[in-house]
Amino acid sequence: MKSLLSLLIVLILTQVSFLNAQNSVARDWNDEILEAIRNDYARPTVHARNLFHSSMVMYDAWAIFDESAETVFLGKTFGEYTCNFNGIITPSNTNEAIHEIISYAMYRLLTHRFKNSPNATISLDNFTTLFESYGYDTMITSTDYSLNSFAALGNYLAQEMINFGLQDNSNEQNNYENQYYTSQNEALILDLYEDNSLINPNKWQPLAFDVFIDQSGNIYALETPEFLSPEWGQVTPFSLKSEDLTILNNSFDSYVYNDPGFPEFIQNSTSDGITDPYKWNFALVIAWSAHLDPTDDTLIDISPASLGNTAINTFPTTFEEYQSFYNFTEGGSTGSGHELNPITGVAYTSQMVKRSDYTRVLAEFWADGPDSETPPGHWFTILNYVSDHPETVKKFGGQGAILSDLEWDIKCYLALGGAMHDSAVNIWGIKGYYDYIRPISAIRYMASKGQSTNTSLNNFDPHGLPLIPGLIEIVEIGDPLAGDDDSNVGTIKVKSWKGPDFISNPATDVAGVDWILGTQWWPYQRPTFVTPPFAGYLSGHSTFSRAAATSLTQITGSEFFPGGIGTFEVEQNNFLVFEQGPSEGFTLEWATYQDASDQTSLSRIWGGIHPPIDDIKGRIIGEKIGKESFDLAQQYFTGTLSNTSISTHKISTEVYPIPALNTLHVKTQYLEEITLQLYSLTGKLIFSKNIKNHQGILDLKLDDLAQGVYILKGVSKSNSLLFQRKIIK
């Protein structure tokens, strides 16, 4: 697969001759961080944070000289970290000062964040090259801006962001290592095709590789990758709200925003296993895998005339609605398409393409394959493409004055960066708590068990795969899969993409689709990557993409790509990386940002990475995050934000003693009406006490409280979170 960036470069070179000779300084540095992400370890959570923090730094460097805007970090308390700022003179040329502050801040911050990258030499050299191309001096390292040095202010801003990042609960100081999480399942050794029937079928299973190549192409020998960022829900967010936070415990405290509830757990089927939502979800993944056969000449219209335009109010909530929303047999989901291009007033032209080519291309296009800038970076790249388009009018939100390139980029990056970071915090908190299984483990598990449809057969098992003629069947005597001495007779076979065992040279070979043993099922991926190393529920792609699409819709003031269509050319036999293909060239097309987002979600099912249960709730949460991030960013842009109105601006508070006996003391700088709420670790409210008149010292009597661990929250009259502490009695 070519990365999205490569496609956009081709598009820009061939269709977008309008590019300015010189980008804004914010765009220059954004391009640098995207390239550094491609050269780093594949860590969507870490890089969403890097993109947000860098966007926040650049925004603050601009905002200090703007008459209306309010800084996010500089001179504020963000999370529980206070970044002091004593002010600086306003120069006669603010653009030059902003350029200098941004460059020094970004150079120092990115050098720190990527110093341990596997390709640190390349990235750090790139940072230095850009920095020195502006005429700046790497030897200026002072952070004392009291003499009105803009270079020093940039260094100071970077150092403060570095310090903040060392206490924002990301565990950056220990290379983001997990502190509490342990997997409940032993690793699946992929190539041995061993029995996988002894795992917990509702929990994530690590994968063991002879050679593992991560999403950015880094090679590891004899590797079993750990769960990436299962504790990320506790990282300081941008716009996530305290009232949407629940602290749950599954062997460690999980900070879960917008709790989606439990996924589908496997049922003990007594007959007709396909009626079990769990089995239906993973059987659908098998069914869609059968679409990846280039010898299948089934044609579908992939133009906006037929695809897209799926309203959020049509998203399923019940099992029956899921069965109607996703087309089990033919693939895809509901969506009426668009009758007309609203920009041109002309109908979209039909584009008939082989389903097998489209589904394979889509799976690779959005996959986190090698050389990926990860999903948050993908959407920054799309944002930059939109910004460069000749039909884009840079009115923020589609209203008001046309902005300079710098102001446009600065504001876009903060809004999108906040949405991407909050998506990572939200979804990885959910992933860490629910710890849900991936298709490769679930399908191999059920196939190891047997079948769950016919109770009269000796291979019936309540946890087996449901039998579906032409898709999931039993190996009979004489079957090509029967094996030596009929050793496989009675086992389960599935009709799916055959997997990497049938590919010697990806440039010339095609695995195709055929019957394979269910215990040897593979997602459509490279054998050195297979599936991202973290739980499936909920889908990061679905959430990142929906949040980004919502952000872009609000940023531009339009649902539609510039000109009413976004197009990406796919060359015959010069796109796929997992195997040869596609067999014909065609053009990927999307009318709206949300159409692209929805196709991203479906691509993960065709690729065998997610079942439907991982998808929809991620889209819904992503929509919410995109709106909330944009709304909060707008408040900063217009200077209408109150420091106590959002969850990330918390009040300095001491809670002691810990552990407490019968009395807990709370000392706070917040002197207005306050409500103290005590919660169990399961999120149950134990008691709530409203205090109107106090001098900043509050006492709580705990005589009747059972021994244990609790969460104490302080909430303002406007229901904003002031502080949150874990306490022990």
Tell me what each language-model feature is.
Residues 5, 15-18, 645-729:
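C-terminal outer-membrane/trafficking sorting elements
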Residues 2-10:
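Sec-dependent signal peptide recognition
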Residues 22-641:
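Acidic/polar surface patches and capping/hinge elements
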Residues 9, 403, 535, 719-720:
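A general, composition-driven signal for non-globular sequence regions
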Residues 12-16, 62:
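Residue-level signal for alpha-helical transmembrane segments in multi-pass membrane proteins
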